[in-house]
């Protein structure tokens, strides 16, 4: 049937049809890099990674742009407060760009661990000041902006469609709710395109209105248009960005005379103890702590168990349950790979039919607004039939089962990178198994069964374990 998405702008599910056949342009609002990422920062990247993987599976060429905000995002998300990165730089006694680099790489490392594909382009806001200045000047020339005391503000009431994404009406927006009243503003609803730098402000650039720095909203408008062009296919981000950030992006672009994003998608919050996970409140679980203690793919699986438009309530019990569920799928995939090597030639009709049903149910789920819970349910519904048929399954059908697991489970869901499919023994388990084999070898030596003793030693050597007999007893080391 093709992909159907819930379009926030249309307020309904709509068929997704790219502007240029065979090509898809996606812009996702990326992180403001002033601290380590928490679990809430992983949900959007994982969700839109599924979308990207789906398009790649379908043969599309995908340009996936996700920015890095390293300037201009103030502490209250509006036009007041301190730049978040500058504030952090003061706390850590670093230069702002040192802070941005440090936490940008922290974010990228976490995304790599979660098997999220790197963006085609990851533009940094600080590298696109000329584009922002050009857009600001264009808005001034068209009467949609005005300058006051070195700052430039967007004249919200000059754009009658302001509010069409969020459903908010100008008359209903109260001064002081999400915007602060400043004396130089014509209207309290107006927002900054360019901010005059106060004395001592570290991050500043020259502009026609004096030294300053960009407003948060203009950054994504300028960068998305630069890399994806007018009328690009999809803009996505968290539900908390819908207003004011995305609303302001639309106003800036369209008031400047540009066609902006054709479709909009928004993912919901990750909750902890019933409250939104957020840096500002400290109500969070850091991603790196989770990734160190748990299999990253089990964490990705956990994120996919809830539909992206629904709030996800994080619990430790839920994570443990997800680890068990992921383990069941991983075990089944490994079983298929292992049995394929020794299975007799031919096909197994019952398995072929089960695979047909799986592929149909899975793709229907994904194409219905990325219903990952239903896609996972299709995989689990397939497991009983698979386990029943595995003992007698033929090689060609097992090869197809492996390919289906790879296409659906890794190609689209991103759950089975090669490293998790390689069953490796390490740590205490490895040491225990070697100790057991050496004990059996010592028993054989005491019984003067040197043939068995030598056989154990040679088999261990073939596996890369070197055994050395000493006065204190046998020692072993891994061959380098």
Swiss-Prot record:
Q: Mind telling me which Pfam families this protein's record contains?
A: CysS_C, DALR_2, tRNA-synt_1e
Locate the motif 'HIGH' region. 31-41
**Compartmental location:** Cytoplasm
Task: Indicate where this protein is primarily found.
Answer: cytoplasm
Instruction: Tell me how the cofactor is bound.
Output: Binds 1 zinc ion per subunit.
Q: Does the keyword Cytoplasm apply?
A: yes
Residues noted as binding Zn(2+) in the record, renumbered to the chain: 29, 220, 245, 249
Which leading EC class covers this enzyme? ligase
**GO CC entries:** cytosol
Sequence motif: 'KMSKS' region, positions? 276-280
Question: Per the UniProt entry, what is one GO biological process?
Answer: cysteinyl-tRNA aminoacylation
Q: What is its EC number?
A: 6.1.1.16
Q: Where are the transmembrane segments?
A: none
Q: Tell me which cofactor or cofactors this protein depends on.
A: Zn(2+)
Residues annotated as binding ATP are 279
Q: Tell me which Gene3D superfamilies the record gives.
A: Cysteine-tRNA ligase, C-terminal anti-codon recognition domain, HUPs
- Which catalytic reaction applies to this protein? tRNA(Cys) + L-cysteine + ATP = L-cysteinyl-tRNA(Cys) + AMP + diphosphate
Listed A to Z, the keywords are:
Aminoacyl-tRNA synthetase, ATP-binding, Cytoplasm, Ligase, Metal-binding, Nucleotide-binding, Protein biosynthesis, Zinc
The entry lists its GO molecular-function terms as: ATP binding; cysteine-tRNA ligase activity; zinc ion binding
Q: What is the similarity comment for this entry?
A: Belongs to the class-I aminoacyl-tRNA synthetase family.
Assembly with partners or alone: Monomer.
Which named protein is this? Cysteine--tRNA ligase
Q: What would be the name of the gene that encodes this protein?
A: cysS
